[in-house]
């Protein structure tokens, strides 16, 4: 069995494709569940289907476990922790918005601005929309059939902002970085500046519309989950937190996911981060693998371990399962 004493408070394990990374992570999970109990160790992977396959392998190995999903996803870990915190505090429990509910909120926000135009009472966001569309009669661009295209862009914008952790307090910094190259501002970067200036107030209006639509509930987008969970980490009691989190395919974590892991690390949760930057497949959704691996070492003080290829050799059922997803 793996010796957990060989791990630091944060350990970053890097291995080539098919070198046995997932099997290494599973071995660590089995050892941690033996030491800490089934509730205090968890493994996060990049997708639900992989989680189910690996979770079944763990359950077969241990015969019985106290948590239904010993292998899950990082958002599920965040949701579980936030639910525990809010339940103890007597607050409404988190519930994710589905796609239809999100569409209703987005269209409500856009309809408010078309209403401003119709009444001749344009607001600051209306002015930004006019600049964004570069036409005087911009309201037609977010109404009727045209609304579908812009609503889709709006939805994607919300997700990308949340995934990179673009908080309101970073607005001025992000706009400045997007707009300038040295002391010059070209047309492309000016366009980026306009987009960022519009994105922040629209997201603020969207968040307020969610609160107005569900005044007695705590509703949030799936992409917003990691941000809110990070804020809740400081409120968590020790029993709400695992002793060890193992993250397989760490290269596919979002920046918001990294912030969540950093907050847990600051609370004393041990981290085992396993992956390979060259195997990233989620860069289009806010994953920056090279940055993640550098930041794990510089910000968390993670010790780098390079996995030897011979670790993949294993005749066990667990090893066979891991080899298919490593």
Q: Model regions: which residues?
A:
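Accessory N-terminal region flanking or inserted into the helicase ATPase core
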Residues: 1-17, 24, 130-246, 257
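Helicase P-loop NTPase motor core
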Residues: 2-7, 11-33, 301-303, 308-326
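Short, conserved loop/helix-junction motifs that constitute active-site signature segments
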Residues: 36, 239-241, 263-268
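Conserved P-loop NTPase-based nucleic-acid remodeling module centered on helicase motor cores
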Residues: 40-159, 294
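Hydrophobic "anchor" residues on beta-strands that sit immediately upstream
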Residues: 69, 244-247, 272
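Conserved Walker B
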Residues: 246-253, 277-278
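Conserved RecA-like helicase ATPase core segment
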Residues: 258-326
């Amino acid at each position: 069995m793996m010796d957990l004493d060989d791990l630091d408070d944060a350990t970053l394990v890097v291995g080539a494709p098919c070198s046995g990374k997932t099997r290494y992570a599973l071995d660590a999970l089995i050892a941690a569940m033996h030491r800490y109990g089934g509730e205090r160790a968890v493994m996060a992977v990049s997708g639900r289907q992989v989680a189910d396959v690996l979770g079944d392998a763990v359950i077969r190995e241990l015969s019985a476990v106290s948590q239904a999903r010993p292998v899950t996803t990082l958002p599920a870990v965040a949701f579980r922790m936030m639910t525990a915190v809010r339940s103890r505090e007597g607050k409404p429990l988190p519930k994710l918005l589905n796609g239809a509910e999100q569409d209703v909120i987005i269209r409500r926000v856009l309809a408010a601005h078309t209403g401003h135009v119709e009444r001749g009472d344009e607001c600051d966001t209306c002015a930004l929309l006019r600049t964004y569309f570069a036409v005087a009669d911009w309201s037609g661009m977010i109404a009727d059939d045209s609304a579908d295209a812009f609503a889709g862009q709006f939805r994607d914008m919300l997700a990308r902002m949340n995934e990179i952790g673009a908080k309101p307090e970073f607005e001025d910094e992000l706009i400045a970085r997007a707009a300038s190259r040295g002391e010059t501002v070209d047309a492309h970067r000016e366009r980026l500046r306009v987009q960022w200036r519009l994105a922040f107030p629209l997201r603020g209006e969207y968040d307020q519309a969610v609160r107005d639509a569900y005044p007695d509930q705590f509703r949030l987008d799936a992409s917003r989950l990691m941000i809110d969970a990070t804020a809740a980490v400081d409120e968590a009691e020790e029993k709400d937190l695992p002793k060890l989190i193992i993250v397989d395919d760490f290269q596919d974590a979002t920046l918001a996911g990294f912030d969540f892991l950093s907050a847990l690390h600051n609370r004393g949760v041990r981290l085992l981060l396993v992956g390979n930057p060259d195997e990233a497949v989620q860069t289009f959704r806010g994953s920056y693998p090279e940055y993640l691996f550098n930041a794990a070492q510089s910000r968390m003080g993670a010790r780098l371990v390079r996995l030897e290829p011979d670790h993949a050799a294993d005749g066990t059922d667990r090893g066979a399962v891991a080899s298919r997803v490593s």
